[in-house]
């Protein structure tokens, strides 16, 4: 009986490990002097280091820094564009990698360089503006 429990435990551990080897790799890029589309999503296998393209955005300006919500349902991005910089919120479908723009807010400063989110807020740090801005979440 003890061997049966050990075998079941090993099967369970193996299946849990197999389930956790693939992740979404979400990559922001600069777009102003190249053909980049903005944000790219890849399937990443942590065991083999292989990655495969899943999806991308269209015409998102310089999403140079990203953060993903704790529940993996939203991606937030800075859109670095000098004094006209913005922060964008996207609905995120983790299975397909699809990102749908929900809204965009002025970054309240130039050249955003860092972005973080918690359960209630999205916070951006602006490099040239020398400030931070806090945006409350509205279901996005």
Where do the PLM segments sit?
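Short loop/turn segments immediately following the C-termini of beta-strands
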Residues: 30-32, 80-82, 127-129, 137
């Amino acid at each position: 009986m003890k061997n049966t429990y050990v075998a079941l435990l090993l099967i369970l551990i193996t299946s849990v490990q197999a389930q956790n080897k693939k992740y979404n790799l979400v990559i922001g890029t600069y777009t102003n002097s190249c053909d980049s589309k903005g944000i790219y999503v890849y399937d990443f296998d942590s065991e083999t280091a292989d990655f495969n393209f899943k999806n991308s955005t269209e015409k998102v300006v310089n999403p140079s820094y990203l953060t993903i919500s704790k529940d993996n349902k939203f991606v937030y991005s800075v859109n670095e564009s000098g004094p006209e910089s913005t922060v964008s919120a996207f609905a995120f479908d983790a299975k397909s990698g699809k990102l749908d723009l929900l809204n965009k807010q002025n970054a309240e400063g130039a050249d955003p360089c860092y972005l973080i989110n918690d359960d209630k807020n999205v916070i951006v740090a602006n490099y040239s503006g020398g400030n931070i801005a806090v945006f409350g979440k509205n279901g996005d």
